[in-house]
Amino acid sequence: MKEELLKRFTKYVKVDTQSNEESKACPTTPGQMELANILVTELKEIGMQEVTVDEFGYVMATLPSNTTKEVPVIGFLAHLDTATDLTGKNVQPQVHENYDGKDIVLNKDLNVVLSPKQFPELADYNGKTLITTDGTTLLGADDKAGITEIMVAMNHLINHPEIKHGKIRVAFTPDEEIGRGPERFDVEAFGAKYAYTMDGGPLGELEYESFNAAGAKITFNGNSVHPGTAKNKMVNAVKMAMEFNAHIPKDEAPEYTEGYEGFYHLISLNGDVEQAKAYYIIRDFDHLKFVERKTHIASIAKELEEKYGEGSVELKLNDQYYNMREKIEPVKEIVDIVSAAMRNLDIEPKISPIRGGTDGAQLSYKGLPTPNIFGGGENFHGKFEYVALESMVKATEVIIEVARLFEEKE
């Protein structure tokens, strides 16, 4: 299993599937369709049935039931795209066997070092096989570890018919990182009663609560005048953006929050005297606080527009997804069965809220309750991203055990 996981994973991460928020297409980048087509071929090769990919890059496939019992159809999902935070082009995965607990030099020329001083959780991986970046890209374990684990689990079940299971559906979706994954996902065609995303982090993570999420695009329109004659005429759009940000509570940012605490996050700010654009994301687990945060953003925009004149501040505020807890708690047994599967494999479940989002958050609101299971990765979205091969083995085993337990309990 280890060898197959390593071979597939290192192949998948070399396909550049970074999504693009500026694109209106689906998928937003051609690399996602490239990977989708690779997976379609491989799904057919291992013996999966009803293998399809649509024009939008959604891959679906079926592993038929091998039991006479009436077992609910379950699904496993992972996303094709990688994050926009750092390039996913020319990913060169590095394999470090029997990690010794010391610094790992990712890139000597650029002095990029993965160090337990900065990332103390590395101590948990002594003796493990770590797959890292070369220090110039992200790795793409989010979520190609999940894709790999689903592929290997299905292959294992096909080759081990003694493991009884109901009908299993798998899906690989585009553009999750920019919040569009479920937009064109056909829940009815997928045909599962329950599903799981393999999109979590370290070993044991199990999540069924997510943020309520919104995005705020703000355009500041200034007035550029020659600096020598600018008095009482110039309006500096960049300074307007700075003034806007000064109204955001400094301690309510990602770098100062954890657990159930929400935040405002300035993703990007660019511009000049004439015009500047800022993009914020707004996150909170509590719906009332979420609404309050959006109201605060809108009130700052209104205040500045009143100060600088009509049209000086343009705000586009949109909801992205909601906390899926509301949709999963009525069917909490689908979380309990994963906890049982983990314990059967000597994994202690770590149930915590997702400080982020998964396709499952939106799918749960489309009628498909979808908790999130660990994929094994650490430090997602950056050059220090890595995954332990042993964690990927465990995630694969969890998929297999969940399928077995669903059949056993009927």
Curated annotation (Swiss-Prot):
Gene Ontology cellular-component annotations: cytosol
Active-site residues, record numbering mapped to chain: 81, 176
Coiled-coil ranges per UniProt: none
Keyword terms of this UniProt record: Aminopeptidase, Cytoplasm, Hydrolase, Metal-binding, Metalloprotease, Protease, Zinc
Binding-site residues for Zn(2+) 1, renumbered to this chain: 79, 142, 199
UniProt-annotated location(s): Cytoplasm
Single GO molecular function: tripeptide aminopeptidase activity
Gene3D superfamilies, per database record: 3.30.70.360, Zn peptidases (3.40.630.10)
Cofactor binding note: Binds 2 Zn(2+) ions per subunit.
Alphabetized PROSITE patterns for the sequence: ARGE_DAPE_CPG2_1, ARGE_DAPE_CPG2_2
Binding site for Zn(2+) 2: 142, 177, 381
Gene Ontology biological process: peptide catabolic process; proteolysis
InterPro entries for the chain: ArgE/DapE_CS, Bact_exopeptidase_dim_dom, Peptidase_M20, Peptidase_M20_dimer, Peptidase_M20B
Lineage top rank: taxon: Bacteria
Predominant location: cytoplasm
Reaction catalyzed: Release of the N-terminal residue from a tripeptide
Enzyme Commission number(s) of this protein: 3.4.11.4
Purpose: Cleaves the N-terminal amino acid of tripeptides.
PANTHER family found in the cross-reference section: PEPTIDASE T
Descriptive protein name: Peptidase T
Organism of origin: Listeria monocytogenes serotype 4b (strain CLIP80459)
Organism taxonomic ancestry: Bacteria, Bacillati, Bacillota, Bacilli, Bacillales
Gene: pepT
